């Protein structure tokens, strides 16, 4: 039996967090080109170290900082949710390239989407759970 291994030159994956959606395209390259919506990642995320570190957790985990260029399209949500959506999409893209990384990413939970979203407002209440003041008399 012949075992066929697929070789891919690029990987495109998507990720989400709250209302933020991210599409990541991972290409072999120098690693210096990380574009988010046409801007450098540091400019887009306003040089915020927390967002950038969170976003590049998968890349740092497998030590591939200088091997791949990343093109990212994000929409919706805030910067923090967008960074977390990129983290999920980047993890999925690396697993698409290298299936052996699946265990490495699964253990810290990088392949799991955070399902927490804003709870809807209910009628009779002021917010999702905040009730109007109660008066006995």
Swiss-Prot record:
An example GO CC term for this entry is:
small ribosomal subunit
Read off the SUPFAM superfamilies from this record: Ribosomal protein S5 domain 2-like
Biological process per Gene Ontology, one example term: translation
Cellular location(s):
Plastid, Chloroplast
- Return the Pfam families for the record: Ribosomal_S9 (PF00380)
UniProt keyword Glycosyltransferase present: no
Which key words are in the record?
A: Chloroplast, Plastid, Ribonucleoprotein, Ribosomal protein
Cross-referenced Gene3D superfamilies, in alphabetical order? 3.30.230.10
> InterPro entries under this entry?
Ribosomal_Su5_D2-typ_SF (IPR020568), Ribosomal_uS9 (IPR000754), Ribosomal_uS9_bac/plastid (IPR023035), Ribosomal_uS9_CS (IPR020574), Ribsml_uS5_D2-typ_fold_subgr (IPR014721)
Q: Is Aminoacyl-tRNA synthetase one of the keywords UniProt gives this record?
A: no
- In terms of superkingdom, the source organism counts as Eukaryota
GO molecular function, a single term: structural constituent of ribosome
**Family assignment?**
Belongs to the universal ribosomal protein uS9 family.
Please name the HAMAP family in this protein's record.
Answer: Ribosomal_uS9_B
- Protein name in UniProt: Small ribosomal subunit protein uS9c
> Which species does the entry assign this protein to?
Chlorella vulgaris (Green alga)
């Amino acid at each position: 039996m012949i075992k066929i291994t697929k070789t891919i030159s690029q990987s495109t994956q998507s990720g989400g967090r709250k209302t933020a959606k991210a599409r990541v395209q991972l290409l072999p390259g120098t690693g210096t080109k990380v574009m988010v919506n046409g801007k450098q990642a540091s400019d887009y995320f306003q040089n915020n170290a927390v967002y950038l570190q969170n976003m590049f957790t998968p890349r740092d985990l497998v030590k591939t900082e200088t091997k791949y260029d990343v093109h990212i399209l994000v929409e919706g949500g805030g910067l923090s949710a967008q960074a977390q959506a990129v983290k999920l999409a980047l993890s999925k893209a690396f697993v698409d390239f290298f299936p052996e990384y699946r265990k490495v990413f699964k253990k810290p939970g990088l392949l799991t989407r955070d399902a927490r979203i804003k709870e809807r407002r209910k009628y009779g209440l002021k917010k999702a759970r905040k009730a109007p003041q109660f008066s006995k008399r």
